[in-house]
């Protein structure tokens, strides 16, 4: 039964009863124990502070609908611009989000131009790649299973000439990765539809075309690729992240393992006929993301985001990895490129027990020298290094783990008003929401806090793509229905005055005398407190304002609900009648409200009811109600009328009396 709002009595209804499942259905003891364990685990997870503190809906005008449902989208945005390009089915959408104005959209049609297909679902032209090339936009799509590319210049579409194999897959459902670096192009897309079933990482444009050996990866799912410019140009590396089938077939071993692979960008292939067209510097290492304290392992890599060091030190680039386990719980582990590089440079090879050849496998050679055949043969037969890549920090554990299933991540490095640096993670969930998580401190003593859950769309849907514009401090997200621009600050969602603003621990926001504002929009210094356990104590007023008193008159023996909005999921909510606790709602409660149900109102249940929110040492009164008997309420109403009549009488008589006194 849906609770009526406060102020309305509930209609009569039978008392709810809870049946004991084991007793009712005679479940076996082992299953009963499993049920008890599952309920206890679910309850424990509900108390985790890794969940978002509040939930917020982005109500801005920066939403634009597609002209049709788009089951597959690709997003392209250039930092600092107001434009977003989105590739859909036979269309490229150009969205414009000017500051302070409504968003607009233009559409360019790019239909199928050739090819024949048997499955009608694959007969469209699904755009899978958008990339700036010269003064135009390179657009590549499936083109009815005959992948092709076009150049888009000023809304004019021209088909690209020349060999374009490897730029787009044959189906939008295929796992694919394309990396551009200057005139070089790297791809994991097969060139032919009906051969080359084994996935490879290729250089498809550059000095010489190369591909990985067919034995070095087992059914890989590619996640991210990047090029890292190191101290010497010949030492520049290509790193790509993927997961693959676990070669360990032990029934207790995980099905998948997560990897990072390295290649030398200057790799020219080998000397022999077997190695001349292959990458000769391929090595791979396992990415570890596990928590020994809870015995939880997260072995399925979902996404990777690289955050460069602000001083330009490539070794200090932070690699944020989102992992999941078979139960769809998630963890975020952070690695450094320096640690990854060290593992590849110093580790022995797994399963190889002889002396390593010189140059050692994976080593980049100057002056474009070819890799000796012996070095290639050792690396090709033993491509995995023995040492594993572990997270940063002394404990080598995840930054945090959560019961939520995270799928994508972007990270913004920002400075608060006092100059302190924070890393703010934006993680997409399988529920179509975004979690905003702040990380501060050094790798030895990090502070992590889940600020909020953002609902970015007008129409709830899965998030297909996300892009961060650090310059304009915006997120761009797409679903099958719409594209949305979301600001990184959103300070207006925090209620509760100064205390509520500071309790958010949002580094983008601060208290400016009378409201919670973005530090980027305020013209003067604002009050902020991010790390402390008691940020509310920084406010000038020691206590938050009390809730306004609300009164309602009720007849005896009636039913009634009192509702208290649960703004913070980290707080415990208590309904008190006078001094007695009548109802408690614990942290992590998924209900939007803490409800006190009065089934049969008696004389002693009239009086004052207060809903208190307790969050650490922060205590505030969220609701204050007084339940009055109907006869008393009527008496108070009559007394109020009498006072009003008396006041009006004296207001009419006093001028006459005063005038009389003045005359005499």
Curated annotation (Swiss-Prot):
What keywords would UniProt list here?
Answer: Cell membrane, Developmental protein, Differentiation, Disulfide bond, Glycoprotein, GPI-anchor, Immunoglobulin domain, Inflammatory response, Lipoprotein, Membrane, Methylation, Neurogenesis, Signal
GO BP of this protein: axon extension; inflammatory response; integrin-mediated signaling pathway; neuron projection development; olfactory lobe development; positive regulation of axon extension; positive regulation of ERK1 and ERK2 cascade; positive regulation of macrophage cytokine production
- In this chain the Ig-like C2-type domain maps to 542-627
Asymmetric dimethylarginine carried by residues: 132
| One Gene Ontology cellular component | plasma membrane
Residues of the region (Interaction with integrins) are 265-267
Write out the GPI-anchor amidated alanine lipidation residues: 646
Among PROSITE patterns, the record links this protein to: IG_LIKE, SEMA
Role played: Plays an important role in integrin-mediated signaling and functions both in regulating cell migration and immune responses. Promotes formation of focal adhesion complexes, activation of the protein kinase PTK2/FAK1 and subsequent phosphorylation of MAPK1 and MAPK3. Promotes production of pro-inflammatory cytokines by monocytes and macrophages. Plays an important role in modulating inflammation and T-cell-mediated immune responses. Promotes axon growth in the embryonic olfactory bulb. Promotes attachment, spreading and dendrite outgrowth in melanocytes.
Q: What's this protein's name?
A: Semaphorin-7A
Q: Which organism is it from?
A: Mus musculus
- Gene symbol? Sema7a
């Amino acid at each position: 039964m849906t609770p009526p709002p406060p102020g309305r009595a509930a209609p009569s209804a039978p008392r709810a009863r809870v049946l004991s499942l084991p007793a009712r259905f005679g479940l076996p003891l082992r299953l009963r124990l499993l049920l008890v364990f599952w309920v206890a685990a679910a309850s424990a997870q509900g108390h985790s502070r890794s969940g978002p503190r509040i939930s917020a809906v982005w109500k801005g005008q920066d939403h634009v609908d597609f002209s049709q449902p788009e089951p597959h989208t690709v997003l392209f945005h250039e930092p600092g611009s107001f434009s977003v390009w989105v590739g859909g089915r036979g269309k490229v959408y150009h969205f414009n989000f000017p500051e302070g104005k409504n968003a607009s959209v233009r559409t360019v049609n790019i239909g199928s131009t050739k090819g024949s297909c048997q499955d009608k679902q694959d007969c469209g032209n699904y755009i899978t790649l958008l990339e700036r090339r010269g003064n135009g936009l390179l657009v590549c799509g499936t083109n009815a299973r005959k992948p092709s590319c076009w150049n888009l210049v000023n809304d004019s579409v021209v088909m690209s000439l020349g060999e374009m194999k490897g730029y787009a897959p044959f189906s939008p459902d295929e796992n694919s990765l394309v990396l551009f670096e200057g005139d070089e192009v790297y791809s994991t897309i097969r060139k032919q539809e009906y051969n080359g079933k084994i996935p490879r990482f290729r250089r498809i444009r550059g000095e010489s075309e190369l591909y990985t050996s067919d034995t070095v990866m087992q059914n890989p799912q590619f996640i991210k690729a990047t090029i890292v410019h190191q101290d010497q140009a010949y030492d520049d590396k290509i790193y790509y992240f993927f997961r693959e089938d676990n070669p360990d077939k032990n029934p207790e071993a995980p099905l998948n393992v997560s990897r990072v692979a390295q290649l030398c960008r200057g790799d020219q292939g080998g000397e022999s006929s077997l190695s001349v067209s292959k990458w000769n510097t391929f090595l791979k290492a396992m990415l570890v993301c596990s928590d020994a304290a809870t015995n939880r392992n997260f072995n399925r890599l979902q996404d990777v985001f690289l955050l460069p060091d602000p001083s330009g030190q490539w070794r200090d680039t932070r690699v944020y990895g989102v992992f999941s386990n078979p139960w769809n719980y998630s963890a975020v582990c952070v690695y450094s490129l320096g640690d990854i590089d060290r593992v590849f440079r110093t580790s022995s090879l797994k399963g190889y027990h002889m002396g390593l050849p010189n140059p050692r496998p994976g080593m980049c050679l100057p002056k474009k020298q070819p890799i000796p055949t012996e070095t290639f043969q050792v690396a090709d037969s033993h491509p995995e290094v023995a040492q594993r890549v572990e997270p940063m920090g002394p404990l080598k554990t995840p930054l945090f783990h959560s019961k939520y299933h995270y799928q994508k991540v972007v990270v913004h490095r920002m400075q608060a008003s006092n100059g302190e640096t924070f890393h703010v993670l934006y993680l997409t969930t399988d529920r179509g929401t975004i979690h905003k998580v702040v990380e501060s401190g050094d790798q030895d003593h990090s502070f992590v806090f889940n600020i909020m859950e953002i609902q970015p769309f007008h129409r709830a849907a899965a998030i297909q793509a996300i892009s961060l514009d650090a310059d304009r401090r915006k997120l761009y997200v797409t679903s099958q229905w719409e594209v949305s621009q979301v600001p990184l600050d959103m300070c207006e969602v925090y209620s509760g005055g100064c205390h509520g603003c500071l309790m958010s621990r949002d580094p983008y926001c601060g208290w400016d005398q009378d409201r919670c504002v973005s530090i980027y929009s305020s013209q003067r210094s604002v009050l902020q407190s991010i790390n402390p356990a008691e940020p509310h104590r920084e406010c000038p007023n020691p206590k938050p304002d009390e809730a306004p008193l609300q009164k309602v008159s009720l007849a005896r023996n009636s039913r009634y609900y009192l509702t208290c909005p649960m703004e913070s999921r980290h707080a415990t909510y208590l309904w008190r009648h006078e001094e007695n606790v009548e109802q408690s709602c614990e942290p992590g409660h998924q209900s939007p409200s803490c409800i006190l149900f009065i089934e049969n109102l008696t004389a002693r249940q009239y009086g004052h009811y207060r809903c208190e929110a307790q969050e650490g040492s922060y205590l505030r009164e969220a609701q204050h109600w007084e339940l009055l008997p109907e006869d008393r309420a009527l008496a108070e109403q009559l007394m109020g009328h009498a006072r009003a009549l008396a006041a009006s009488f004296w207001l009419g008589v006093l001028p006459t009396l005063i005038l009389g006194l003045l005359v005499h």
